[in-house]
Amino acid sequence: MRDILLTLILAGLLPVSLRRPFIGALVFAVISLANPHRLTWGFAYDQPWAQMYALATLAGILFTRERIVGDSIRRYLPVLVYLAWMGVTTAYAFDHPSAMFRWQQIIKVHLMCLVTLMLLSDWKRVKQLVWVAVCSIGFYGLKGGIFTITTGGEFRVWGPQSSAIEDNN
């Protein structure tokens, strides 16, 4: 049941993100931070939802008429310098194959961060993105808090499997 509900919601929002790329960026943030598909048990568990929304958002940017903030390199310079430095350090890593694998994963996320930064055209959108991040991470804080209280702190609280917040740190 969770699979069907999540698939209907995410599949229904995909065309919306083609018309309004900022919605796609918000859904990408939810998928990246909350990993809702990892709370399912069936076919939706391993679907590449983040990839679908990244592609839909990028396609939406190509065809949108809304204002995209790309006028000044100063806005993106810190992120671009950081990405360049990550590339340099990855090239000289001791365990190069492992470092390249991780770099390929992380560069995709940072690409979407740049895309989201381009779509933050006003203060309202910044607030929306902050609330999406707060609610996505706060969900697991609330869920973990309730679990800890009901079990008396006997077990560890883990995040969703194969996610950035999987471990206990």
Segments (PLM) and residue ranges:
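Hydrophobic alpha-helical segments of small multi-pass membrane proteins
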Residues: Q105-K108, V134
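Non-cytosolic membrane-interface motifs at loop->transmembrane helix junctions
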Residues: S98-Q105, G159-S163
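Juxtamembrane helix-loop transition sites at the ends of transmembrane segments
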Residues: W41-F43, H110, W158
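Hydrophobic alpha-helical transmembrane segments
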Residues: V16, L83-A93, V115-N169
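Short amphipathic alpha-helical "recognition" segments used for binding
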Residues: L55, K108-M112, F147
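Transmembrane signal-anchor hairpin modules in multi-pass inner-membrane enzymes, especially those
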Residues: M1-V88, P97-F101, M118-S136
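Hydrophobic transmembrane alpha-helices of multi-pass small-molecule transporters
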Residues: P36-H37, V109-C113, G141
